[in-house]
Amino acid sequence: MDHHALNIQITIKLFAAYQDSYGVPELQREFPNQTTVKGVLDSLIHEHPELETWRDVTRFGVNFKFVEADTLLKDGDEVVLIPPVSGG
């Protein structure tokens, strides 16, 4: 069985606090098939616990559309995590 058939490659675009924590504007990651947008967020918060503050206020986009946290991802999707951004 092809190992990669069980995983999906996604691009994660980072903004504001997420970009500050990771120091890069985007990440390429592999996740198990059937991963949700929330699963991606959980993974990032696990790696950078200081992002927990933003868990409940982050909006999600997939391929330039706003989506709910339980949206299933497909191979090649582009996920955007958008925390509240103050003006200035």
Located regions from the model:
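Ubiquitin-like/PB1-type beta-grasp interaction modules and other compact soluble beta-rich domains
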Residues: M1-G87
